[in-house]
Amino acid sequence: MHKKSFVTTLSVCVMILGLAALGFAQEAAEGGAHHANSGAQMKDFMWRTIDFALLVAIAVWALKKADVKGSLAARRSGIEKTLQEAVAAKEAAEKKFAEYSQRLDQANKEIEVISANMKREGELEKERIIAEANDAAARIKAQAEASAAQEVLKAKAELRAEAAKLAVELAEQKIVKNIAKGDQDKLVGEYISKVVTLH
């Protein structure tokens, strides 16, 4: 492989030298009389060409010594490996993302179900509390009405008793004022005769 590259490089250098020599030969044929120093120019050109060929040969040797192709191959291999790792990491990340997205969707669904259950239970609890409050209010109202009715009955009984007491007192006062001693004896006698007749 190295020998083939060296032969190729040497062939390129020889072709460049040949083309340069051909160019100078043509120029010398066309206007050789005008240039007295064409031999000196040719010698200068040859040294420059040799310098260039040596420079190319040294560059090729240095590149081979540095193993640029191997370095580039290693670099390419490293880049391919890194790229494969990046692709694998991307696929793993996409898989994880899909998994987490699925979990998040599932969690959202569960949250919605829990929220709906809590809302439904809250509504049922609200209805139960309202029903209990209505029952308690009805019981309190019934108790209040019963207490009020009892109080009214008690008040009526007390009023009747008081009215009867007052009526007796008033009647007694009127009787005491209006009845004379003879009337009293007459009434007692009538009462006694009624009692005797009944028995």
From Swiss-Prot:
Highest taxon listed in the record's lineage: Bacteria
Membrane topology: Single-pass membrane protein
UniProt keyword Ribonucleoprotein, yes or no: no
Keywords: ATP synthesis, Cell inner membrane, Cell membrane, CF(0), Hydrogen ion transport, Ion transport, Membrane, Transmembrane, Transmembrane helix, Transport
Transmembrane regions listed in the UniProt entry: 5-25
A cellular component annotation (GO) from this entry: plasma membrane
InterPro entries, A to Z: ATP_synth_b/b'su_bac/chlpt
Glycoprotein listed as a keyword: no
GO MF annotations, alphabetized: proton-transporting ATP synthase activity, rotational mechanism
N-terminal signal peptide: none
Compartments (UniProt record): Cell inner membrane
Assembly mode: F-type ATPases have 2 components, F(1) - the catalytic core - and F(0) - the membrane proton channel. F(1) has five subunits: alpha(3), beta(3), gamma(1), delta(1), epsilon(1). F(0) has three main subunits: a(1), b(2) and c(10-14). The alpha and beta chains form an alternating ring which encloses part of the gamma chain. F(1) is attached to F(0) by a central stalk formed by the gamma and epsilon chains, while a peripheral stalk is formed by the delta and b chains.
Protein purpose: F(1)F(0) ATP synthase produces ATP from ADP in the presence of a proton or sodium gradient. F-type ATPases consist of two structural domains, F(1) containing the extramembraneous catalytic core and F(0) containing the membrane proton channel, linked together by a central stalk and a peripheral stalk. During catalysis, ATP synthesis in the catalytic domain of F(1) is coupled via a rotary mechanism of the central stalk subunits to proton translocation.
Family that this chain belongs to: Belongs to the ATPase B chain family.
Protein name as it appears in the record: ATP synthase subunit b
Protein source organism: Citrifermentans bemidjiense (strain ATCC BAA-1014 / DSM 16622 / JCM 12645 / Bem) (Geobacter bemidjiensis)
